[in-house]
């Protein structure tokens, strides 16, 4: 509805993590809106055995706020060497996590924990690029390989020395993969 309201007839969707989950959902519901789809560090399904982890995060945010979630999230989102080096990127993300409203975080956790699109994504016909950090724990390479197998003609790029925020850990390699893909479709 937003794209239509803005008068945007078609778009190149680039979605990271939950943004990739949203992109898959929208591409299934309104395929005519997509010139291409880039799915970054995301998944088409969260396994049922992961639900208790998501429930625990919800409980923590409800009862203690965001602070207790900060360091664990950073450890999942960045490789250990990158996190240890710290720097402005890690500090910026640390601040973003701290300033996330718990209610918004809880809603996202609940949406993510119920995701199950794998059996439907073969219907995605838009040219699709899948990018994943080789060390992504939350949406691992195996999940990207499933999407790559199911979405006909999709391309898979695995970035070395990167976890869940591969765009931040390996910005040059990420941007090269992204612009190379989009450059052929603009």
What is each stretch, according to the model?
Residues 126, 140-149:
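Short alpha-helix in the alpha/beta-hydrolase fold that links the catalytic acid
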Residues 134-139:
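Acidic catalytic loop of the alpha/beta-hydrolase fold
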Residues 124, 130-132:
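Short beta-strand/loop motif that positions the catalytic acidic residue
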């Amino acid at each position: 509805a937003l794209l239509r309201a803005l008068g945007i007839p078609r778009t190149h969707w680039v979605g990271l993590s939950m943004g990739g989950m949203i992109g898959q959902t929208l591409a299934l519901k309104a395929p005519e809106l997509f010139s291409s789809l880039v799915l970054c560090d995301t998944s088409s399904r969260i396994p049922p055995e992961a639900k208790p982890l998501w429930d625990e995060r919800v409980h923590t945010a409800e009862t203690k706020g965001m602070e207790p979630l900060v360091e664990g999230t950073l450890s999942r989102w960045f490789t250990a060497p990158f996190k240890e080096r710290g720097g402005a990127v890690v500090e910026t993300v640390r601040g973003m996590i701290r300033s996330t409203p718990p209610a918004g975080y809880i809603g996202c956790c609940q949406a993510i924990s119920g995701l199950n699109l794998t059996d439907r994504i073969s219907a995605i016909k838009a040219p699709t690029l899948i990018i994943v950090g080789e060390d992504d724990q939350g949406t691992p390479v195996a999940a990207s390989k499933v999407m790559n197998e199911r979405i006909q003609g999709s391309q898979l790029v695995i970035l070395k020395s990167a976890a869940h925020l591969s765009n931040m850990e390996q910005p040059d390699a990420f941007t090269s993969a992204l612009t190379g893909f989009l450059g052929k479709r603009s």
